Amino acid sequence: MAGNAYSDEVLGATNWLKEKSNQEVFSFVFKNENVQLNGKDIGWNSYKKELQEDELKSLQRGAETTWDQSEDMEWETTVDEMTKKFGTLTIHDTEKYASQPELCTNSTCIGSRGPGFRALEHTKYSCCGHCRNPEHWGSWFQSLPRWSTEPNLVRDRGGFESVLRCGTVEERLQRAAELGLRYDGASS
């Protein structure tokens, strides 16, 4: 219906222009004695035309493929960078950073510095294992193998990511022990 109404409006305007074309004022504006209008009714589907040339089609396909690949590569690059960053972080590093005064709050084993800035809470439930307070250590820390000839590497990507998802250092060490990762006990 909308197409028919549009066509009727176009025909009405064309007929009006043809009727008025013989009048003196109208012909003076167009500076032409005999005005002829030629038109074509254009529908919405006429605006998207398929390309006729094979070369242009291949260029379009190539551009679309390149765009898709660039988006995929950006995503993969970001994931690979994150994995590399996590790969360099060992279990010992997480303990070392968790035991730093600026990373702990409400700590009784760090000293008299008081509460720090960061969000990690240092209690007997989330102890770093290096503090001077043995009651914070618990049996889980002593049960971990402390000597290993193997380097502190991760066997699979998913296991290490699950270790990093754990909230506290204690949970990380427990998860690492479940996965068979070794804690070498070295301090730097």
Curated annotation (Swiss-Prot):
This is Non-structural protein NS2. The keyword Protein transport does not apply. It is found in: Host nucleus. Interacts with host SNRPN. Interacts with host XPO1. The keyword Metal-binding does not apply. Plays an essential role in viral protein synthesis. Plays also a role in active nuclear export of mature particles before host cell lysis, by interacting with host XPO1. Keywords: Host nucleus. The lineage of its organism: Viruses, Monodnaviria, Shotokuvirae, Cossaviricota, Quintoviricetes. It comes from the Viruses. GO terms for biological process: exit of virus from host cell nucleus through nuclear pore. One of its GO terms (cellular component) is host cell nucleus.
